[in-house]
Amino acid sequence: MQLNEPAPTPTLARSLGEPAHVSGWAIRLAKVIGAGDRFAEWLLKAAVERGATHYRRDFDPSLPPDNPAISDEEIGVALCLGHQPYHLDNVRAAAQLLSSPRVDAARLCRLAVRERCEPVLLHIAAVAERIAPALEPWAYLRQHLPPRPVPRADALPHWTRLVSHTAVTAQGG
């Protein structure tokens, strides 16, 4: 007998070699929004609408609208949760959204610890240090977020996938 079930989508935590922490906070947030099992898709849509424009695409119009009661910090952290599907665009969109001057670095730091996504945010902060060392909230996170190593940090985006490359064109300029 052969089972032809699709393979489950790997999670971000599994790709990092960690057990996935299933966030009760994120489950409640998905219910409040009305996104259900499409929470990750809604998060990306909300991040794009709030400024992560590099990841603009056509989203399903049946997704719930953005909810201004949910902060940029919450959307960014939720995109980096270990139980989310392993889609690096989520991490990249979180990096762009959280680079906004609207972000409260101390609040972001508290959320990151509570939701166990310190390795992802510290990876982004390390990339920011190479390009713009004083850029907030990343400078704050490097100083205040406790490090938590993961077995496979190579699963996170290469630094070149987290920065804008100016003066680079398809014609090689």
Model-derived features: positions:
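Basic, Lys/Arg-rich alpha-helical nucleic-acid-recognition elements, primarily the DNA-binding modules
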Residues: 1-28
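Intrinsic-disorder-associated interaction segments
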Residues: 5, 9, 22, 32-37, ...
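Polar low-complexity intrinsically disordered regions enriched in Ser/Thr and small residues
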Residues: 20, 27, 37-39, 54, ...
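Helix-turn-helix/homeodomain-like alpha-helical modules used for DNA recognition
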Residues: 29-98
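Hydrophobic alpha-helical interaction segments
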Residues: 75-173
